[in-house]
């Protein structure tokens, strides 16, 4: 399938199956997506191949997705952010981001592939607020 967009997407989740599945859904829909299980690896790669969109789990053991998003914005200011989580503790992390001027929206997880694609396509059209998917 040929790419329908030049959008470079990084998908980060500490669970390989989730990162790979989301990247596959995006690739099957014509997007260029790279899966990572290590947020530090995603940051290193971003220095070489600046992503247009970061899709990341919020709750990861070595670095939260919110911290990853904030660091990604420092490395790649034009990168848009899409976060997801199944953890209630997400609210505390979001508060930190809001205090730094980022206004995240909260949606329920699991996200249906159609919903994921709608959000990604929406990110193609807007440079504003990041999205958080949570349970």
Task: For the regions a language model picked out, list residue spans one by one.
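Non-catalytic signal-transmission and effector/linker regions of two-component phosphorelay proteins
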Residues: 1-8, 112-135
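Conserved acidic segment of CheY-like receiver
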Residues: 5-17, 22-26, 54
